[in-house]
Amino acid sequence: MKPLRLKMQAFGSYGKETTIDFEKVNQNLFLITGDTGAGKTTIFDAIVFALYGEASSSLNKKEGVVLQSQYVDFGCEPAVELAFAEGSGENCEIYTVRRVPRHLKTITRGAGKGKQREITGSVSLIMPDGMEYPSKETDRKLQEIVGLTKIR
């Protein structure tokens, strides 16, 4: 599995939409550097979250609402989108997975106006042929494609 593009919005330390294009790198090694708190771990959390539905760091116990950025208001939907390639040469296939974590959203109308309510997360997987894979089976399919579980 080779990551091609990672897009994050309102996710972890990334408030505004941020895209990392791994294809711009023409080397076999990609180095992620930065100051403490700059968002390096969030990049790995986003990749693992896209593939497995939970953050990479089990020590941090990051899941759901905790993944929602504190740098945007509750009206901005947190999301991660990862485009990745599987295989090589003529057998290379490109997949795109998009996950929205469980998050809080501000109610804008009615009796609960101004309060937050929890929104259920979602996932979609676009196959190489452009068709969307059934969301109920996406986690299993991603493990099959990548060949690894989160623990491995």
Feature annotation, model-predicted:
Residues 1-145, 150-151:
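Extreme N-terminal "head/tail" segments of very large remodeling/mechanoenzyme assemblies
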